[in-house]
């Protein structure tokens, strides 16, 4: 279900054919706060908004947010396309599947996906992965491979349709296709209330 759609590339250049996808449908069950973690603030901004703004600023052809467990419309910018994943309880793979199905209908030839709970992934990482000359590219932060991950349309049919593994399945099964790109930033996700408190108490990589 498309909740709203007002996002187009703002660039005057020829379209890249790649959309950014922020996965933000999970329940965040490990987070013991009074609100869903994606609505909690990091540096005065809702966590999911921090991640979405970084993706949107990359200037890819479209920025898509997949939500499910909690309504995020009130904190998202108007420029994004919001998809509601009604099957979110079946795992993150369902959100990625919903995104690539939509991206295919829009004529995109690839998607770059990241997570809504990673506030330290900068726009530059989205740009680098989005422009990678490979159908399977992943950001590498100090040697650790983490989202954003680019998946070309030729590989979409190989993605799982359910479960908590999405792009990781391809990275593991098709290592010969993977292009790892060194990126600056902090790929840590906010899973617990302690993670949030730690992030907000330090100025590291802000």
State what each model feature region is:
Residues 146-157, 193:
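Conserved nucleotide-sugar donor-binding
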Residues 41, 120, 150, 189-190:
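Short aromatic/basic micro-patch
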Residues 2-3, 12-16, 157, 162-206:
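Conserved alpha/beta core of the MobA/IspD/sugar-nucleotide pyrophosphorylase nucleotidyltransferase superfamily
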Residues 14-145, 175-183:
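Nucleotide and nucleotide-moiety/phosphate-recognizing core
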